[in-house]
């Protein structure tokens, strides 16, 4: 008997689609409106065209924030992805310890971002923090509130602690989806662990690793709460990433025109980089 397909199933999700579109389109149009105007009190607006876009794109402040953002994203991806895969490979696939390991890996992801920043702010203080006292006890002058290198080290370490678990869980799900027949065939061929990883595990994990890298890229490129609570963008502007700089311009200086233009440029950069990255990953997978 031929199954009948219900062609109007989309009607059930239409309200949600309209709600999401409504919540996204109106704020976006508001930002576009501010990005081409100069605003004054009493709802007085003057048309400025692309003036704010030119100002942002030619701003050394924007260039410096963008470079810091790209450097931070590159560093944490180079650390978190290999580390997450290594931890996933070390985790048991069967037995009572599976649940224990999964719960431990999920715990950092359940902590709110502002709490993570506050925790690491206390943890890294040179006078009372466990991390700060331990590093200073080794004879290394460490103070993330005054030293840009120490602030970067602490910010990267905090992000690695908070988000490597996401890569671990996704990589572990990919490993668990590999049929046992592959491992049995490798055992018959006396394959070494490196060969098993290279020819069996890594190819089977490509799709989940693509998702993990894409998620971590987008999240790290838009990071705000943790570094802002930890360092406030300092010392100086050493940890002022694009998101922090955008908030300072919009809410600190109340320059709505440049802030709106910068937010749209920011959005387009994230969208473009994600599209390029995803296209390259999918092309490599097809090949």
What are the functions of these language-model segments?
Residues 4-287:
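A structural signal for multi-pass alpha-helical bundles of membrane permease subunits
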